[in-house]
């Protein structure tokens, strides 16, 4: 399952960064549990699960439509697969795919629609047919509907179900996963401190995220933690006493306005509260 990196397109996703991050993840092999409070596209958790199958894995995301997708992928993958195959076969052209995209967006935005399978189908459809991979914040992309909303991608979903079958998946606030257990490794990929609001309904999960409180929360616990952030002196100053590493990271998405233009020149910052040896500097 080497080709199984993430079933989703997600802004800030780490599918291309896992190999560069591996040297900072060496501590994981000594642990019994892996936790990820901001699951997003899940590429790091999938990478860890495949590389360290002995670990108990607890993943979480506060964004409910995303959480719901992962739960359905885990618990009802056959129905998800069959429904998406049927929809793709009936909407093969961009014109009909756009109609499906708009209906899916309307369905997902109506909070009275609580059928978990249909909401997961709608989320996946929007994710694959949009410019950015976002839901409420996205617009339809003809190119994405053809290249990303594909039978090939849908056919890979059962493979992801096998990988995540033993995950504990929750929809709670990140701090509930923090702990003092030194045999629990925690990887945190919070909303970045940037100008654009990418996550949640109308960007609420970016706009409303308290970065100062997040730093204080992480600093209170002694379990090994690795945090991904946008590199800035302000971020580093919040994590006094933590070790840092940086590497270049170019994302594949180019369609979220000024945010993505800025990404071409930025560094990925890693903060960690444990010792490492033999680190290699990546460019």
Predicted regions and their residues:
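Short His-Asn-centered micro-motif
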Residues: 37-38, 60-61, 170-172, 188-190, ...
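Short active-site oxyanion
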Residues: 31-34, 54-56, 164-167, 219-225
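Short loop/helix-cap segments at secondary-structure boundaries that form the rim of catalytic
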Residues: 51, 178-182, 234-241
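Short, solvent-exposed loop/turn segments at secondary-structure junctions
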Residues: 41-44, 63-65, 129-132, 174-177, ...
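Long, positively charged, glycine-interspersed low-complexity recognition regions
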Residues: 205-283
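Conserved S-adenosyl-L-methionine
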Residues: 30-92
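SAM-dependent nucleic-acid methyltransferase catalytic core
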Residues: 2-24, 28, 74-201
């Amino acid at each position: 399952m080497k080709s199984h990196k993430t079933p989703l397109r997600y802004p800030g996703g780490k599918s291309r960064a896992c190999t560069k991050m591996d040297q900072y993840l060496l501590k994981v092999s000594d642990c019994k549990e892996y936790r990820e409070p901001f699951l997003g596209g899940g590429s790091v958790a999938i990478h860890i699960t495949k590389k360290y199958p002995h670990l108990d894995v607890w993943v979480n995301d506060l964004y409910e439509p995303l959480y719901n997708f992962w739960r359905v992928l885990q618990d009802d993958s056959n129905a998800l697969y069959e429904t998406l195959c049927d929809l793709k076969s009936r909407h093969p052209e961009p014109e009909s795919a756009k109609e499906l995209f708009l209906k899916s967006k309307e369905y997902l935005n109506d909070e009275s629609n609580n059928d978990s399978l249909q909401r997961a189908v709608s989320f996946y459809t929007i994710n694959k047919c949009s410019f950015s991979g976002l839901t409420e914040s996205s617009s339809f992309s003809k190119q994405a509907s053809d290249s990303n909303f594909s039978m090939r991608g849908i056919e890979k979903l059962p493979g992801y179900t096998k990988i995540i079958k033993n995950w504990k998946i929750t929809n709670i606030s990140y701090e509930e996963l923090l702990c003092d257990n030194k045999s629990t490794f925690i990887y945190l990929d919070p909303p970045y401190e940037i100008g654009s609001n990418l996550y949640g309904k109308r960007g609420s999960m970016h706009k409303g995220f308290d970065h100062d409180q997040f730093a204080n929360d992480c600093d209170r616990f002694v379990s090994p933690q690795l945090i991904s952030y946008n590199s800035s002196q302000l971020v580093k100053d919040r994590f006094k006493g933590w070790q840092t590493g940086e590497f270049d990271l170019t994302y594949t998405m180019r369609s979220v306005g000024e945010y993505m233009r800025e990404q071409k020149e930025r560094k990925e910052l890693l903060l960690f509260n444990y010792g490492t040896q033999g680190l290699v500097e990546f460019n």
